[in-house]
Amino acid sequence: MNKILFYLFVYGVVNSAAYDLLKAPNYFEEFVHRFNKDYGSEVEKLRRFKIFQHNLNEIINKNQNDSAKYEINKFSDLSKDETIAKYTGLSLPIQTQNFCKVIVLDQPPGKGPLEFDWRRLNKVTSVKNQGMCGACWAFATLASLESQFAIKHNQLINLSEQQMIDCDFVDAGCNGGLLHTAFEAIIKMGGVQLESDYPYEADNNNCRMNSNKFLVQVKDCYRYITVYEEKLKDLLRLVGPIPMAIDAADIVNYKQGIIKYCFNSGLNHAVLLVGYGVENNIPYWTFKNTWGTDWGEDGFFRVQQNINACGMRNELASTAVIY
């Protein structure tokens, strides 16, 4: 088999939803080639295979029971704990108080459209990849500000997550942070630069921000305690995409479709709510993630509405108003 045919074969098998657990060794070798894995020793490779096999079994079970589809992907040789530790970054707060105004979403929702998506209005920037840096909090907050800027100025921009990692001393850089405290930090810093002026490094570094290059400034911030999940529809249409906290453990191997089974064993990841809709009579929310476009639905994922999917109904959703 020539090299081109080999990789076409690998791509087709690894991306198939009809997995067979008995073929786990074959899938694993294909996975190793596709993602250029080098484990350093046979002992470590065997350890990774056992984790891979466990994840494959879970993928098969989910594909049999959920309306969404799951696949072998770049995280499939990592345990859930490893993935959460390396690729998320939401820090659970000791206390949630800061100077962002608290709003309780405890009123029934108003009447609105059955479907709405800020992407269709070209107000959502491209999906980014946080890599092995626990800065989801920075990506989600800045993604919302990028959308705020697009709504206000009809221009898509990319803001600097690295500035947040290096210069936000309220949060902890690649070691984690929170959404409302990130907005607080931006207010204290005075603004945020463009990513092109302060490129992403996926690591903690010294603060090098230049206030003369601030493009976006925050004047107010809000934190929401979600009682009625449906009320998020009104809020989304009113204020723009919303950074939210979730438990990402059940979305790691997600490929496509509407997730019905996503539980909350502890909030650990920040994502951006960008829309909602209905498919096959199932109402869903659409989120933008920060794991690259090679994950999920081109970097986005959908969950069923009104089941507190992934623990999304909590008190950590936050937004900000820009000048």
From Swiss-Prot:
Keywords from the named record: Disulfide bond, Glycoprotein, Host endoplasmic reticulum, Hydrolase, Protease, Signal, Thiol protease, Zymogen
Reactions the enzyme catalyzes: Endopeptidase of broad specificity, hydrolyzing substrates of both cathepsin L and cathepsin B
SUPFAM superfamilies found in the cross-reference section: Cysteine proteinases
Glycosylated residues (UniProt): N158
Positions annotated as active site in the UniProt record: C136, H269, N289
Transmembrane segments: none
Compartments it resides in: Host endoplasmic reticulum
Record's function text: Cysteine protease that plays an essential role in host liquefaction to facilitate horizontal transmission of the virus. Accumulates within infected cells as an inactive proenzyme (proV-CATH), which is activated by proteolytic cleavage upon cell death.
Range of residues in the leader sequence: 1-16
InterPro entries cross-referenced by the UniProt entry: Papain-like_cys_pep_sf (IPR038765), Pept_asp_AS (IPR025661), Pept_cys_AS (IPR000169), Pept_his_AS (IPR025660), Peptidase_C1A (IPR013128), Peptidase_C1A_C (IPR000668), Peptidase_C1A_papain-like (IPR039417), Prot_inhib_I29 (IPR013201)
Xref: Gene3D superfamilies: Cysteine proteinases (3.90.70.10)
PROSITE patterns, alphabetized: THIOL_PROTEASE_ASN, THIOL_PROTEASE_CYS, THIOL_PROTEASE_HIS
SMART domains tied to this protein: Inhibitor_I29, Pept_C1
Activity profile over pH: Optimum pH is 5.0-5.5.
Entry protein name: Viral cathepsin
Disulfide bridges in this chain: C133-C174, C167-C207, C262-C310
One MF annotation (Gene Ontology) recorded for this entry: cysteine-type peptidase activity
Similarity field: Belongs to the peptidase C1 family.
